[in-house]
């Protein structure tokens, strides 16, 4: 299956200041990594767990 286009987007912290640890798919590396998410205006390449991230974006 093809991965969704949003899996290629860079991580987006957003304008808020909550500093939550989330996961994004790093297309260059081929796996999911953590980033700091501010808590609002999430983009699609933002997952609560590495498992969800890999399930959505890692199985190309």
UniProtKB/Swiss-Prot annotation:
Gene3D superfamilies found in the cross-reference section: Pancreatic trypsin inhibitor Kunitz domain (4.10.410.10)
Molecular function (Gene Ontology), one example: serine-type endopeptidase inhibitor activity
Highest taxon of the lineage: Eukaryota
Keywords of this entry: Disulfide bond, Protease inhibitor, Secreted, Serine protease inhibitor
The keyword Disulfide bond is annotated on this UniProt entry: yes
Function: This inhibitor has activity very similar to that of the basic protease inhibitor from bovine tissues.
UniProt name for this protein: Serum basic protease inhibitor
Organism lineage string: Eukaryota, Metazoa, Chordata, Craniata, Vertebrata
């Amino acid at each position: 299956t093809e991965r969704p286009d949003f899996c290629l987007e860079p991580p987006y912290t957003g304008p808020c200041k909550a500093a939550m640890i989330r996961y994004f798919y790093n297309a260059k590396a081929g796996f999911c990594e953590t980033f700091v998410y501010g808590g609002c205006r999430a983009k699609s390449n933002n997952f609560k767990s590495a498992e969800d991230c890999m399930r959505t974006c890692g199985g190309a």
